[in-house]
Each structure stands twice: as structure tokens, then as C-alpha cells.
Amino acid sequence: MPTIQQLIRSARKKITKKTKSPALKSCPQRRGICLRVYTVTPKKPNSALRKVARVRLTTGFEVTAYIPGVGHNLQEHAVVLVRGGRVKDLPGVRYHIVRGSLDTAGVKNRVQSRSKYGVKMGSKTAAKTAGKK
């Protein structure tokens, strides 16, 4: 524990919290334009072709964002909404594209966790919830 004299000489330093998604500039989401849509392979124990997009945000940053869910309709010049959130097995991917907003369509035939994939209540889901009652 420092003495009062030591504290007078140099005050305690505040620990600054480093943001995990600096390109969003303290906003929950940002709009961006797809520059390139492609697939990448994950880190060592995993094996797949993960769909990602290079996006230029309205903040001026150019980031790599993950496209969640099965299948997508994204092409070059598509306008997308980007949120924070990394993908653990893809180095350098610190953002997710929000499904079901702007030019991004929701996941087809999705019944569970629909809100995360931009899917409205469909006849398939309505029948399932009616059957539970």
C-alpha cells in the first residue's frame, strides 16, 4: 500500500476499458456496405467453410463480419447491419451481420431461436405452438 507522500508524487492511474468492437464507435449496431462475400476455414480443431463478408461501415472502418445461419442472400454492394460479437474459431472476425434487417434476409424454415435469425412467426411455428396448448 502506498504512503500519502507516494500518492501525492504520482496519483493512482485509472484503468481504461478497451472496447472489443472499436469500429462501432460505442453504438450497438452500424450500417455498412458489403465489399466482398466469401468463405474462410476455421482454426485448428474445427473444419468448415464459414461465410463472412468484408464490410465498409458508416464510421469509415473496413471490417470482417460473420454471416450467421444456414444460407444467405448477400452479394457485393448489399447494405447490411453489423453488430459486435466475435467468432471464436475465426481469427480477426469480431463482428456479426444482423439477419432479417436491411438487405439481409432471415434464415429460411427456421423454427427455434427465430429472433436471432430475423424470422417472423410462420405457419409452421404457429402450428407447433398451437399443438403445445
Swiss-Prot record:
Its main location: plastid. It is found in: Plastid, Chloroplast. Changing K14T: Streptomycin resistance. Pfam families: Ribosom_S12_S23. GO terms for molecular function: rRNA binding; structural constituent of ribosome. Changing P91L: Streptomycin dependence. GO terms for cellular component: chloroplast; ribosome; small ribosomal subunit. InterPro entries: NA-bd_OB-fold, Ribosomal_uS12, Ribosomal_uS12_bac. Keywords: Antibiotic resistance, Chloroplast, Plastid, Ribonucleoprotein, Ribosomal protein, RNA-binding, rRNA-binding. One of its GO terms (biological process) is response to antibiotic. Belongs to the universal ribosomal protein uS12 family. Part of the 30S ribosomal subunit. NCBIfam families: rpsL_bact (TIGR00981). HAMAP family: Ribosomal_uS12_B. With S4 and S5 plays an important role in translational accuracy. Located at the interface of the 30S and 50S subunits. This is Small ribosomal subunit protein uS12c.
